[in-house]
């Protein structure tokens, strides 16, 4: 499996963020996007996720589902946790599982995998910032998709939470998955760097 972008141009708010950008990541590989603030790291993740449309260029996934858009074969974990405060941990995760569709796994397994088994019935409003982040990470587990797009994924996680997430990323890569991440802190796994924008 290979995820690639060719001659990508991104414009936001009338400003060109980048042009002529190319990238490539193979199954089992983590690609870390590096560059100064505003260089377009988050914009590239959002292009791959289908949340933005490129002004030019193409994004393809060789070895994926041929009739399924790349965006529907990717998970995007952004800055915000996108949780409904009044819903429980289990209900929030169930909502995302049903919304995302595809091949599904057991909710309880996903909740336990991120260390929230004791809080499955607790409303999200009562979770700490780190627990909310763990619940967002659980979305990656209950619907299997080969591409993980991660924007500052370890924000709000304590050391134990970061170690847990490292294990989940390692398992995803071992299954042949792809990770593309924008982060200011090390992911804790081997990565290949992709510079976005001019070197600083």
UniProtKB/Swiss-Prot annotation:
Q: Which SUPFAM superfamilies match?
A: P-loop containing nucleoside triphosphate hydrolases
The ABC transporter domain sits at 3-200
User: What SMART domains is this protein classified in?
Assistant: AAA
Q: Where is the signal peptide?
A: none
Q: Where in the cell is it found?
A: Cell inner membrane
Gene3D superfamilies reported in the protein's UniProt record? P-loop containing nucleotide triphosphate hydrolases
**Record text on subunit structure and interactions:** The complex is composed of two ATP-binding proteins (CcmA) and two transmembrane proteins (CcmB).
Q: What does this protein do?
A: Part of the ABC transporter complex CcmAB involved in the biogenesis of c-type cytochromes; once thought to export heme, this seems not to be the case, but its exact role is uncertain. Responsible for energy coupling to the transport system.
Family membership noted in the UniProt record: Belongs to the ABC transporter superfamily. CcmA exporter (TC 3.A.1.107) family.
| UniProt-recorded name of the protein | Cytochrome c biogenesis ATP-binding export protein CcmA
What is the native source organism of this protein?
Answer: Rhodopseudomonas palustris (strain ATCC BAA-98 / CGA009)
